[in-house]
């Protein structure tokens, strides 16, 4: 009986520690480009330029990073199964509402079929039932941005400077106030 209790507690702890961690990361991403992976919770990467991308949003529009040249970009990587991600969608929506006339834009990225995410069609149906309409949700259907930026857990925030440099990476929860502070601090 004691062994079963210890085993149950061990499994419970392991499950809690990995709540929003990616347990299905492709080995290709971990072996091919280790130079782009972030190993710290916060990372200053201002010398690296952010790679341009062209992704379709849930809204059907195509978004390119280069479309926002001259503005700071907050990129939120998240998943529909991540409870922390879901609990902060309201803050993300509020930041996007407030971006009018500011020097930044808010974009979010999901990767259908990667890391346990729903298919693109299932995700679109699910997302349309939510009430967060002020920020674009980009579909990284090939997982290219996940690989490029070494995204291994959710949520993950990338901050791109107005010059296109990758200014900061933050893994895990980030309050709206901390996001705003970071957007003010980067160039």
Q: Which ranges hold each PLM region?
A:
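Positively charged n-region of N-terminal signal peptides that target proteins for export
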Residues: 1-4
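C-terminal motif of bacterial Sec signal peptides marking the signal peptidase cleavage site
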Residues: 16-19
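Bacterial signal peptide processing site
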Residues: 21-23
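Short, internal strand/loop/helix patches
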Residues: 123-160
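N-terminal "domain-start" segment that seeds a small globular fold
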Residues: 25, 29-65
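Conserved redox-active cysteine motifs that mediate thiol-disulfide chemistry
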Residues: 77-94
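Thiol-based oxidoreductase modules, predominantly thioredoxin-like and allied folds used
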Residues: 103-118, 134-142
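Thiol-/selenol-based redox modules, centered on thioredoxin-like
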Residues: 159-187
């Amino acid at each position: 009986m004691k062994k079963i209790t210890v085993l149950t507690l061990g499994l419970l702890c392991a499950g809690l520690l990995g709540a929003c961690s990616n347990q299905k990361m492709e080995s290709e991403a971990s072996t091919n480009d280790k130079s782009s992976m972030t190993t710290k919770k916060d990372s200053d990467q201002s010398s690296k330029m952010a790679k341009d991308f062209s992704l379709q949003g849930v809204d059907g529009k195509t978004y390119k990073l280069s479309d926002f040249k001259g503005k700071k970009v907050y990129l939120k990587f998240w998943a529909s199964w991540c409870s922390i991600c879901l609990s902060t969608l309201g803050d993300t929506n509020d930041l996007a509402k407030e971006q009018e006339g500011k020097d930044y834009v808010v974009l979010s990225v999901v990767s259908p079929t990667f890391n346990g995410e729903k298919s693109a069609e299932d995700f679109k149906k699910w997302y349309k039932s939510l009430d967060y309409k002020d920020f674009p949700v980009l579909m990284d259907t090939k997982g290219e941005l996940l690989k490029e930026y070494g995204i291994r857990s959710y949520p993950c925030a990338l901050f791109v400077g107005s010059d296109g440099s990758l200014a900061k990476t933050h893994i895990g929860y980030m309050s709206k106030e901390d996001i705003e502070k970071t957007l003010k601090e980067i160039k």
